[in-house]
Amino acid sequence: GFVDFLKKVAGTIANVVT
């Protein structure tokens, strides 16, 4: 769903930042 998509994006950003 859309929430899962947001979670995926947030996770990707977190991986890039860290």
From Swiss-Prot:
Main location: secreted
UniProt KW Secreted keyword: yes
Residue stretches in coiled coil: none
Threonine amide carried by residues: T18
Annotated GO CC locations: extracellular region
Signal peptide: none
InterPro entries: Aurein_antimicrobial_peptide (IPR013157)
One record GO biological process: defense response to bacterium
Cellular localisation: Secreted
Expression sites by tissue: Expressed by the skin dorsal glands.
Keyword GTP-binding attached: no
Highest taxon in the source lineage: Eukaryota
Record keywords, A-Z: Amidation, Amphibian defense peptide, Antibiotic, Antimicrobial, Secreted
Task performed by this protein: Shows antibacterial activity against B.cereus, L.innocua, M.luteus, S.aureus, S.epidermidis and S.uberis.
Name recorded for this polypeptide: Maculatin-2.1
